[in-house]
Amino acid sequence: MSFRREKFIEFGGPDGGNGGNGGSVIFVASSAVNTLLYFRYNQHIRAENGKAGSGKGKFGAAGRNRVVEVPVGTQLYDEDGNTLIADLNNIGQQYTVAAGGRGGIGNAQYKSSTNRAPTYFTYGTLGEEHCVLLKLKIVSDVGIIGMPNAGKSSLLSRCTASKTKVSDYPFTTLEPHLGVAYANGCELVLADIPGLIENASSGAGLGHKFLKHIERCVILLHLVDCSLPDIVSAYELVRQELKLHSQELAGKQEVVILNKCDLLSEGEVREKQKLLESSTKKEVITLSMGDELDSLIVFLHAQVKKAVVTEPSDTSFDPFLYVHYNKK
């Protein structure tokens, strides 16, 4: 509230200006970041307050928005983690997490023919304050799936420069790993998904935690260990878990590879290849440790281009993190 006070002006009248609106907290999906690590150390995010109005009818400046870049594939849930608020799938997509408050109204705005000197004004409103849960799903061109010890991490390491842990025991991979493969001008992002076991769709093994990451892959690369006594059952077990998780996941395009063929004779490999092709009704590729992979990368790149790409492939795995956003 303010009144004009100048020499020789007896009845200056009200001249209090309005306050500025507060800034908002806005999330923008960006390819410049690929983890949620920033929020581990910045759990409270505030935008700038609006400035107060002043005399001579001066309006206060609006507060600057706080724009925070997040990886493509970031999902925002309510505090309980049950309700999806926003899904930032595309570069440049944005969501206002907490809107800024409205500025107050100065007494000059209440001047009228019946009230030439109003002595009242309106306070501004508080900005929004929210506590949300961030989740990040892997987004890749090719998701490498299969049972534990099928050779997924070894294949990723050979195709890319990804330094994933490789050992001869189940569940060596405890979190998804990404790698970028290059061959003959083709670029491909591959994700090594931890092995799936029976009842993975119900949370057994590492299932529940990582089945959701496969949803963001364009196509699936299904590895089957050639040395297993029953390769058909091994293949069908993984397929069944995909179906139980979601029909959308089970309907993704799939390339089947019979891996570790160097452990068997050529005759045994051909026999198992025919058996698996007969069961899956798909062409099965055989792969040994010493095989060159450029042709495989080019082939997978062509399959990705044919598939309907609905999501970008430019992010990485990160644990779920609680982040508290507020602006007052």
From Swiss-Prot:
GO terms for molecular function: GTP binding; GTPase activity; magnesium ion binding. Its cofactor is Mg(2+). Keywords: Cytoplasm, GTP-binding, Hydrolase, Magnesium, Metal-binding, Nucleotide-binding. One of its GO terms (cellular component) is cytoplasm. Gene3D superfamilies: GTP1/OBG domain, P-loop containing nucleotide triphosphate hydrolases. It is found in: Cytoplasm. GTP binds at residues 146-153, 171-175, 192-195, 259-262, 290-292. Its main location: cytoplasm. Residues 1-139 form the Obg domain. Its EC number is 3.6.5.-. Residues 140-309 form the OBG-type G domain. One of its GO terms (biological process) is ribosome biogenesis. Mg(2+) binds at residues 153, 173. It is an enzyme of class 3 (hydrolase). CDD domains: Obg (cd01898). It comes from the Bacteria. Pfam families: GTP1_OBG (PF01018), MMR_HSR1 (PF01926). Belongs to the TRAFAC class OBG-HflX-like GTPase superfamily. OBG GTPase family. An essential GTPase which binds GTP, GDP and possibly (p)ppGpp with moderate affinity, with high nucleotide exchange rates and a fairly low GTP hydrolysis rate. Plays a role in control of the cell cycle, stress response, ribosome biogenesis and in those bacteria that undergo differentiation, in morphogenesis control. NCBIfam families: Obg_CgtA, PRK12299.1. Monomer. This is GTPase Obg 2.
